Amino acid sequence: MSDLLRVIQALRFDGDYRETLRGIPAGAWGRLLRLTDEAQLTLPLALRCAEFLPEDVRTRVQSDLARNAERSQRTMAAYDRMAAALNARGIEFLILKGFTQWPHYCEDLRFRPQYDIDFFVAPGRVHEAAEAVGGLGYEPVRESRGPATDHLPTMLLRNGWRWRGDYFDPEMPPMVETHFRFWNEDRELFPVSGAEGFWERRVFREIEGRSVPALCEADAFAYATWHVLRHALHGNLRLYHVYELAHFLDHTAADDAFWSECRHADAAAMRLAWEWFKPELHAAARERMNALPRAASRWFDVFAFSPALALETPNKHELFLHLCLAQGWRNRARIVARRLLPTNPPRVEKDPHVTRVDLRMQLQRMAFRVGFLARRAVLHMRSLGPLALGGVQWWRAWRRA
């Protein structure tokens, strides 16, 4: 078992498996913490498993908790300024995910990782909303190229902050995404149901003394499952988001009222959360998971942990799940081509918060971009072998499905 899978096992909800962490060699923790930082599992590890960690690791993650608590306060203050700017223009909005996940997805908002604030804006006013946020000093990270996915280009505060490898830096300003739809069927190549009523069913939630517009509980869970599924299928899943789903499933296992209203949550995302963290399930959740198409269900039998293992060894096994969910052979061919021959890699920029861009910074950014693309190419090539081997496994499993 890989060390990362030991962490996932230690965070399960169906028993106490924390003792497994003692099997991780002392010298492996440095690399492992870099993985859990990236996967956003460091904070739940600190909260639930501190006494099973080596002393130096425990000291480090307890410091992470304290600094994230300060980050959380600053994030809420940033939200207050943005909300005031939108309200001043009479722009209606709601918040997706983020701090509206409390309390069902996390025990304490101070210890939830959050790096951006996601607004969904009233139809027809998304550009005006971005302009209002821009009045606070936020600018698009990059100019939009081609059709957007679900939101306008990400915006950030150009205040001179620089990334130093610290995921819990209180000085790190949150980024902003302004959404105009909940699901992009043209991009994902299969539909989901229920999004057309999300806006009308929005509610206000009391969070740390403020009234925050948000999705109603059933719609918020549905959107959270779609979010996990979308990122899983594109190979950029944050493991913490799966943990949050498991936390929610475990805490609503006896909530008949909720499950009588929850009609649009994605069963594949719930199955992933159950496979990893084994939450207790309401009968309705289990019934929906059992209703997955046979081929998709078989994928979990073979590749359930592949999205987590991909942090260490790229594999692209999520491609086979996407093929199960997509409709029509033409769409499936598009998915295969998109994953095997990527033509639009993510655009990144070194120190995007820096305000003064001189020739030296331009050269540094160019070198960073070249290095990033080279690393992406290497990761892509490394994934092809495991993908081919997985293809053989999948073909055999699919024939038995």
Task: Go through each PLM region and give its residues.
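Conserved NTP-donor binding/palm subdomain of two-metal-ion nucleotidyltransferases/polymerases, i.e.
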Residues: 1-115, 121-401
